[in-house]
Amino acid sequence: MPLSRLIIQQFRNIKACDIALSPGFNFLIGPNGSGKTSVLEAIYLLGHGRSFKSALTGRVIQNECDQLFVHGRFLNSDQFELPIGINKQRDGTTEVKIGGQSGQKLAQLAQVLPLQLIHPEGFDLLTDGPKHRRAFIDWGVFHTEPAFYDAWGRFKRLNKQRNALLKSAKSYQELSYWDKEMARLAELISQWRADYVAQMQSKAEQLCQEFLPEFHIQLKYYRGWEKETPYQQILEENFERDQTLGYTVSGPNKADLRIKVNNTPVEDVLSRGQLKLMVCALRLAQGQHLTEKTGKQCVYLIDDFASELDSQRRKRLADCLKQTGAQVFVSSITENQISDMRDDSGRLFNVEQGVIEQG
């Protein structure tokens, strides 16, 4: 469902804005520091309950204000508007409303508004630790497997309890009861993740090949422990090692999506521009898989579109985004940088010192 309207109040340097949006492309044009990234950040907050730039709520609330508001309206397939909103206060209090109903959960926001973010710091998906790639996989599983969210939450709680017990346990028998349920959840979570990667892998590799035809891209899922060994057996066999270290070494919390280019780690081969294109390909593949499985469309947020990309690569990405038919928000310093994306259905907004006006 595309956003038809966006209202932002007291968010960073945006005191207040109320804008009607295109179901296709929406361009935010302005100099650095003008507030265009803050618009993307506010939309991200609306879909995730947090900023992608700061974990501290106080930093995104406007100075001398006690709270912020972000509200949106969506058009569903029947052209009915669904209102959603989030209110955050400096003391950490968060209120979520969906369809006018208060007390909703952040996970429900994420279900209503599936977002894909492409921004200058997004290389961490490819170059940093496994947690970023686990989050990438889990975004897809969350949106396609209804039971995943609760199962993953239960596993993490059990893992935390197990780590606490490791410090005092005198034998493995003291952990065996907890490990049975933990192993059941681990096998379930791992299978969901493996199925998801298998389903979207060909699309991801195809898009990577289109964006980077000079390279052979390989994706491989690692579940976090030895492939052929049941997880409960791993827990029992590794008890002494886990106890020495003070935490559970193996498990779905160690899973990874291993990505190689010509059998070499991506960071050793690709330039920054090529890394950005690969991130774009992976995000687009996820969005297309979501649409195929659920009928939902992603909303794409692209911050600093021209960064790291020459004109040919910008055009390639623009063409691919157009083909999705999804709603896209793009920030750019100049109109010239987004010329390949412009059409009659898109809307352009000029952003200056936190003021957003339709161009």
From Swiss-Prot:
Keywords: ATP-binding, Cytoplasm, DNA damage, DNA repair, DNA replication, DNA-binding, Nucleotide-binding, SOS response. InterPro entries: DNA-binding_RecF, DNA-binding_RecF_CS, P-loop_NTPase, RecF/RecN/SMC_N, RecF_2. GO terms for cellular component: cytoplasm. The keyword DNA repair applies. One of its GO terms (biological process) is SOS response. ATP binds at G30, P31, N32, G33, S34, G35, K36, T37. Transmembrane segments: none annotated. Disulfide bonds: none annotated. One of its GO terms (molecular function) is ATP binding. The keyword tRNA-binding does not apply. It is found in: Cytoplasm. Its main location: cytoplasm. Belongs to the RecF family. The RecF protein is involved in DNA metabolism; it is required for DNA replication and normal SOS inducibility. RecF binds preferentially to single-stranded, linear DNA. It also seems to bind ATP. This is DNA replication and repair protein RecF. The gene is recF.
